[in-house]
Amino acid sequence: ALAMLLSVTAFATETAASWSVFGGNADHNAVVGKAPTTDVTVTALKLLKPDSGWDGVDTVPLMQTVGNVTYAYVLYDGHADGCTLAKINCSANTPYVVWHKQLESKSGFQLSTPLLVQGSNDNSEADDVIYAASNSGAVYKITGLQASDTDATGVEATKIYTVSKGQINTPIVSYGDYIYFGTWVGNGTIEGSTEPGRYYQVQVANVPSTSNDSYPVQSVSSIYKGFYWGGAVAVGEKVYFCGDGGYLYYRPMGDGFGTTADTDIYATSISLPSVDGNAAGDVRSTIMTKDGKLYFASKGSSIGNVYCYTIGSNGVPAFSWGAKLSCTIGNDTYSGNCTSTPVIADSGNIYVGFYSGFSAGGLMKITAPTSGTLGTASLITVEGAAFTQPVQCTPVVYTDDGMDYFYFNTNSGTGAGYCFAVLPDETDAVEMWKTDNDTYALGGMAICNGYAVFGNDYNHLYIVK
């Protein structure tokens, strides 16, 4: 897309046969145990108002398997049909759209990946809920997902909250009784004349009876502009998220999430350091966590950084190491911005996407330092040649029989979906499959039960199995 890119809860069940949040699970690690590798079948569906535009599918789909059927849900801009949620049957011999549900008539970029909260019945969607945000700043609770007709009869979208200012551009995530999301204001600062974006905690489960049917909300201010694609992660009793200006924030979950004064946020924020002389710039990546550490990437000015922070016993993160997204092969240097969330394969390897405009980029393997604080980046090549397509999404990784497979799509005028395979101790990959060239594909893939799904700006939705 030409505009730049969730979670175990106390009230939801997350299963291996689901991709219910950004990154597939509460840790946002995008690691799956089953994925299409060879002899694939590709189906390209056309959603509402297809074949043109720059603001079609800009989010990552949600997926779940109910009984023996795998479904995908995708939030997208239907142009004249407005902000729309679609349900797709991926398991049919020829995948098809089950229903479309318009949330709002207003058209525009829909950049917030929704959240699927699954109920206790694995054989029905009747007790499942989707939380989705529109580009107008409204958050919807969507029920009746079991509907089976194209007009979505029985699907109800209830507006539960509207932000006062800005766009909701982050994934919606959930921990405990709460959902979390952030807003972005293009020119705001915490002590300036224009207020910046905010991060919100909305209580959607175990709501106290004194709330008069409303959902209790707390929020904190960003220091600079706001939050763009920066999805939150929770570890222990704290919630962590990143924003523009190169800041990492940490707040207590629950009653203490908000601040008395906006400027109190300084006490629980960290200004990210430069890495090898390269300033952080904005952070437009969701945080991934593994083994008590936080991993994320910064966009940078022209070159991004990957960061690793260790969570202390008091929940306060401390800088562990960083890597600048630049490497040299022969006489050629490869580098770029980053909005991709780093992923750690079961092999232990760290992979991340990068881009430079809409015509260059690729994938890098990140190696943590054995001593010191400076990691290294290595370009993933394909059969000895540089792969130089822009990758703004978060790759999905699958490790099988000693091989790392990663799945991603490219945000270029000929954008497509790819599967690469590489030995864990190598950086030269083999292309396993590729969809036909199409158009800008920003949001990344979701993979569930062996099905890979992604969309693009032309409202083309690809199902690979």
Model-derived features with residue positions:
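Bacterial N-terminal signal peptides
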Residues: 1-7
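C-terminal juxtamembrane segment of a hydrophobic transmembrane alpha-helix
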Residues: 8-12
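Extracytoplasmic/lumenal domain signature
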Residues: 13-58, 62-465
